[in-house]
Amino acid sequence: MEELKSIIRDIPDFPKKGIIFKDITTLLSDAASYQRMIDLLSHRYIGKRIDKVVGVEARGFIIGAALAYKLGAGIVLVRKPGKLPSETFKKTYDLEYGTDTLEMHTDAIKKGERVLIADDLLATGGTMSAVVDMVDSMGGELVECCFMAELEFLNGRTKLPVERVFSLLKF
């Protein structure tokens, strides 16, 4: 894992002063590293009968689509409001200073389908908690929330069903 961690670069003071941003684009643009990351994540779920992989806008699409392909599952997109063309299920959730809303097509997950949620990074857990609620409300059976990386010092997993959280890389 250290070789993958070493490829992710730190960008100081982005998006604002005092934050050290973990830039995953360096890992994604390196074919061997990207393939290794997807192989490591997908290996965890082989044989777990995943029906749908939920990818969270926007970098979760990059990981979710590749995992869905490897697992023979469908991909479901969770997007910001107004980006999906059909009827949507909406979830508004609290941020540190305000609220945000996510949407998913109402027919994207059927009752009883086994769902893997994929995103690039677990930080505070607010977004992922909202997505878990959406999957639950639609009748999906959450297998796990998987992340390429986790910022452990932000304690995001405390907002999630901890036994169903997996992060490949931890910072």
Swiss-Prot record:
UniProt keyword annotation of Repeat present: no
GO cellular component: cytoplasm
Localization of this protein: Cytoplasm
GO biological process: adenine salvage; AMP salvage; purine ribonucleoside salvage
Main location: cytoplasm
SUPFAM superfamilies referenced in this protein's UniProt entry, alphabetically: PRTase-like
Top enzyme category: transferase
Pathway the protein takes part in: Purine metabolism; AMP biosynthesis via salvage pathway; AMP from adenine: step 1/1
Annotated InterPro entries: Ade_phspho_trans, PRibTrfase_dom, PRTase-like, UPRTase/APRTase
Pfam families in the record: Pribosyltran
EC id: 2.4.2.7
Keywords assigned by UniProt, alphabetized: Cytoplasm, Glycosyltransferase, Purine salvage, Transferase
GO molecular function: adenine binding; adenine phosphoribosyltransferase activity; AMP binding
Catalytic activity annotation: AMP + diphosphate = 5-phospho-alpha-D-ribose 1-diphosphate + adenine
Record function comment: Catalyzes a salvage reaction resulting in the formation of AMP, that is energically less costly than de novo synthesis.
Quaternary structure note: Homodimer.
Family of this protein: Belongs to the purine/pyrimidine phosphoribosyltransferase family.
UniProt xrefs under PANTHER family: ADENINE PHOSPHORIBOSYLTRANSFERASE
Name of the molecule in the record: Adenine phosphoribosyltransferase
